[in-house]
Curated annotation (Swiss-Prot):
NCBIfam families: tRNA (guanosine(46)-N7)-methyltransferase TrmB (TIGR00091). Keywords: Methyltransferase, S-adenosyl-L-methionine, Transferase, tRNA processing. PROSITE patterns: SAM_MT_TRMB (PS51625). Pathway: tRNA modification; N(7)-methylguanine-tRNA biosynthesis. The active site is at residue 149. It holds the Pfam family Methyltransf_4. The gene is trmB. It comes from the Bacteria. It catalyses: guanosine(46) in tRNA + S-adenosyl-L-methionine = N(7)-methylguanosine(46) in tRNA + S-adenosyl-L-homocysteine. This is tRNA (guanine-N(7)-)-methyltransferase. Catalyzes the formation of N(7)-methylguanine at position 46 (m7G46) in tRNA.
């Protein structure tokens, strides 16, 4: 255990009276995981072809994909099953996936290579950094956030990715008419997201009753979701459209 009073040798010392630099609270925790042969193949062969790096200026995705097409960005695609299925089903659309966990990145890219898809690109870094630095304003047709970590404990709610500031950031990146699509299997988090998004300016809830939309056909059902349904667990989808 490291003595918390001893500064890290690579960290600059903070003089008395000097404010420490603000550190943004992240919504994810890095986890180590074993890599399968297929996942390693995805990283080794797929990342050089389809991986993107953080830039200091918005990326020209028309140039990246070699065309102008409807564009979707998914944050936290996990093992990539849904994103892969959606990309294969809609070759006329472009998909940008963001995921920090290497096994998931490798799994998605292995699928991209196996299926010969050309409409997928991947960032393996913090989604907030990607949105702030790489995505131009008013450029996305859809942003998807499926089953984010709900951070159940009250003291951890500040780690939830859906916050008023995040809603505003997403809105700035969507085109007018673009949709922020969220899904969760945790009822209290669904209520929380609905509360945040209902007061976020510039959005319209696409649900007729201003609550939750029926499960959209375009969102694939995962094995985890099927297992939950058998156990009686609910899933809530929210769709908010940018109106101005």
């Amino acid at each position: 255990m490291t003595d918390s009073h001893v500064p890290h040798p690579e960290s600059p010392a903070v003089e008395e009276g000097e404010e420490r630099p603000h550190r943004r609270i992240k919504s994810f925790v890095m986890r180590a995981g074993r890599m399968t042969e297929g996942q390693q193949r995805g990283l080794d062969q797929g990342l050089p072809l389809y991986g993107l790096s953080l830039t200091d200026a918005p990326v020209d995705f028309d140039q990246v994909f070699g065309r102008a097409a409807p564009r979707t960005l998914e944050i936290g695609f996990g093992m990539g099953h849904s994103l892969l299925e959606m990309a294969a089903a809609a070759p006329e659309h472009d998909f940008i996936g963001v995921e920090v966990h290497s096994p998931g990145v490798g799994a998605l890219l292995n699928g991209v290579l196996t299926q010969g898809l050309t409409n997928v690109r991947v960032y393996d870094c913090d989604a907030i950094e990607v949105l702030n630095r790489c995505v131009a304003d008013n450029s996305l047709d859809r942003l998807m956030l499926f089953f984010p970590d709900p951070w159940h404990k009250s003291r951890h709610h500040k780690r939830r990715i859906v916050q008023p500031e995040f809603a505003a950031l997403v809105r700035s990146k969507l085109k007018v008419g673009g949709v922020f699509h969220m899904a969760t299997d945790w009822g209290p988090y669904a209520e929380y997201m609905l509360e945040v998004m209902s007061v976020a300016s510039g959005y319209r809830n696409q649900a007729e009753d201003n609550q939750y939309v029926p499960r959209p056909a375009e969102r694939p059902i995962t094995k985890f979701e099927r297992r939950g349904e058998k156990l009686g667990h609910g899933v809530w989808d929210l769709k908010f459209e940018k109106v101005d």
